[in-house]
Amino acid sequence: MSDSLDNEEKPPAPPLRMNSNNRDSSALNHSSKPLPMAPEEKNKKARLRSIFPGGGDKTNKKKEKERPEISLPSDFEHTIHVGFDAVTGEFTPDLYGSQMCPGKLPEGIPEQWARLLQTSNITKLEQKKNPQAVLDVLKFYDSKETVNNQKYMSFTSGDKSAHGYIAAHQSNTKTASEPPLAPPVSEEEDEEEEEEEDDNEPPPVIAPRPEHTKSIYTRSVVESIASPAAPNKEDIPPSAENANSTTLYRNTDRQRKKSKMTDEEILEKLRSIVSVGDPKKKYTRFEKIGQGASGTVYTALDIATGQEVAIKQMNLQQQPKKELIINEILVMRENKNPNIVNYLDSYLVGDELWVVMEYLAGGSLTDVVTETCMDEGQIAAVCRECLQALDFLHSNQVIHRDIKSDNILLGMDGSVKLTDFGFCAQITPEQSKRSTMVGTPYWMAPEVVTRKAYGPKVDIWSLGIMAIEMVEGEPPYLNENPLRALYLIATNGTPELQNPERLSAVFRDFLNRCLEMDVDRRGSAKELLQHPFLKLAKPLSSLTPLIIAAKEAIKNSSR
């Protein structure tokens, strides 16, 4: 009798999404992002010789002295003129544009772009309706900048809660202004560094969401696209912003304005940032929770305080842009907040950089979004915490640029924290807009997709898309080919909900404020913190049953 009473007093289990038990266990290898191909040993040695000309044997030194120095061509441009024939619905050579450049023949759309377009599922009608948007997304997809900004590091084993820690600290941060002590790395210089990367290896395509996070209604992409590695660096000049014609510039072998930092200079700079001492004497009970391409993530206990932390151990020799790690550490060190997974400490241990971060055992919000159903009060609570983090970052001139459920970590107490500053940008009042294309496509703001100058409100758009994730289990257009998804983001405006009638009027208004196409009318983090929807927020402890239910569902599906 008492047992039956106890059972009646227990609250009902949180509702699970229909897809939680229909997953292929093989999908639980969370390698959602493709890893770059390992460069050939010969290429590695050649690159090292180019960076450290003093190295090598005496014979090579003698040959180097005998060889005359010939400078690289500078400011070389390959201009491509693309027009659009409204009658045939085809992209054609732009005869007018070619006349503007004497001696150049009209070329039309590059062959690799034509191949991308054929497999993109963008219909002829859509191409005819907005050819400029098509060119914008083709330029993005073909851009090496996008390839170099992919988060290559994804863990292959261990606790899924490691996800946010493994993705963080990638050497792909771009900063518009440098924090103290950091070497100046301008946007243009960073792009030139990317051009020097080995072009022989094919770039990875934009990875769709892992199969286990898709709903039962999600169609797989019909055909994967192999993105050609074309060094496409210059933004479309204002004079060429025309719906029927655009001039695109391909720069090759541009002369470097400033040389890269040497390994010794990078180590010297890191020594001025990191703590002195042996971290093995400060932390104990190391437990591996994840493995990535350039490092390993462990949990450990701080001996003095008993605090559980996450420690990422990165082999510096395997980091493609070691100098940018400095910028990221400084940005994170200077921006601490209760709603951010905070940087705690760092150490140099031999050839490794150890970065110590807060540890949240609840895992990423993606687990909760894909495995359970959240109500509006719980969604409001998550949105409030994220907006508090964004308000703090934006007030400190930092744009996150990759807001999505994967980058929100949860504590078992329901705490909500923003992580992964691999794409973050620091801006100044003098340079309050940026125009680089970074982030994850399905969460991107339209102004980012179309390569316009943008500000902190790109994070607000992404937050709105993440709110849709919390309602529907996935972002809009996830079932589309990535290239077509970019086109739809650029042209459709605010995405439509599957069942808007199920949402309250105040929630729909909140989404509309986040997903406003007109950036000036889109709410800021500070403004949205006053939105009536956030008054519906439940206590953060209401997220704990969802976190437990998500972990249980993942555990059961892996059996």
UniProtKB/Swiss-Prot annotation:
Phenotype caused by lack of the gene: Mice show significant abnormalities in synaptic plasticity as well as deficiencies in learning and memory. Pak1 and Pak3 double knockout mice display reduced brains characterized by simplified neuronal dendrites/axons and reduced synapse density.
Activity control summary: Activated by binding small G proteins. Binding of GTP-bound CDC42 or RAC1 to the autoregulatory region releases monomers from the autoinhibited dimer, enables phosphorylation of Thr-436 and allows the kinase domain to adopt an active structure.
Annotated residues for binding of ATP: 289-297, 312
Any GO BP annotation: regulation of postsynapse organization
Segments of this protein annotated with the region Autoregulatory region: 65-150
GO cellular component, one term: glutamatergic synapse
Region (Linker): 84-282
EC number: 2.7.11.1
Reaction catalysed by this enzyme: L-seryl-[protein] + ATP = O-phospho-L-seryl-[protein] + ADP + H(+); L-threonyl-[protein] + ATP = O-phospho-L-threonyl-[protein] + ADP + H(+)
Oligomeric and partner information: Interacts tightly with GTP-bound but not GDP-bound CDC42/p21 and RAC1. Shows highly specific binding to the SH3 domains of phospholipase C-gamma and of adapter protein NCK. Interacts with the C-terminal of APP. Interacts with ARHGEF6 and ARHGEF7. Interacts with GIT1 and GIT2.
Identification of the protein by name: Serine/threonine-protein kinase PAK 3
Natural source organism: Mus musculus
